[in-house]
């Protein structure tokens, strides 16, 4: 079975190259999109922007973005939330250190009293009482 031969005129090929080549060359010369002001000044969360425009495997980062859970909030994160939230900022900031220390205490034993629980209950808590 013989297929009819089709010859493409050089004018059509030239026209196609003239239409497609300049945009392709221009797209190579264009720099990456500039970083938004909020990301440059670190005033907002730019995790998605960094995933899209940063180095590395973008697909893996984007696919796992929703599955990631942030680690335990540090003092810096809690201080930031206290300053940005409504309410009594001074009370929250003044008690923040005490709450951080309280989180480090071990949980009491389940069931009846264990020897460490009674020793902890009888030991005085830190700080002077005036």
From Swiss-Prot:
The keyword Mitochondrion does not apply. Transmembrane segments: none annotated. It comes from the Eukaryota. One of its GO terms (molecular function) is type 2 orexin receptor binding. The modification Methionine amide is found at residue 96. Residues 1-32 form the signal peptide. Disulfide bonds join 38-44, 39-46. The modification Leucine amide is found at residue 65. One of its GO terms (cellular component) is neuronal dense core vesicle lumen. Its main location: endoplasmic reticulum. Keywords: Amidation, Cleavage on pair of basic residues, Cytoplasmic vesicle, Disulfide bond, Endoplasmic reticulum, Neuropeptide, Pyrrolidone carboxylic acid, Signal, Synapse. Neuropeptides that play a significant role in the regulation of food intake and sleep-wakefulness, possibly by coordinating the complex behavioral and physiologic responses of these complementary homeostatic functions. A broader role in the homeostatic regulation of energy metabolism, autonomic function, hormonal balance and the regulation of body fluids, is also suggested. A modulation effect on luteinizing hormone-releasing hormone (LHRH) secretion also suggests a more minor contribution to the regulation of reproductive function. Belongs to the orexin family. This is Hypocretin neuropeptide precursor. The gene is Hcrt.
């Amino acid at each position: 079975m013989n297929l009819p031969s089709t010859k493409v005129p050089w004018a059509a090929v030239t026209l196609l190259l003239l239409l497609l080549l300049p945009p392709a060359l221009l797209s190579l010369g264009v720099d990456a999109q500039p970083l938004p002001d909020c990301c440059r000044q670190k005033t907002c969360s730019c995790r998605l922007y960094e995933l899209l425009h940063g180095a590395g495997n973008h697909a893996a980062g984007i696919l796992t973005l929703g599955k990631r859970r942030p680690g335990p909030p540090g003092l810096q994160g809690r201080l930031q939330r206290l300053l940005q939230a409504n309410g009594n900022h001074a009370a929250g900031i003044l008690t923040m250190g005490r709450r951080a220390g309280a989180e480090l205490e071990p949980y009491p034993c389940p069931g009846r009293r264990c020897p460490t629980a009674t020793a902890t209950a009888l030991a005085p808590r830190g700080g002077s009482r005036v």
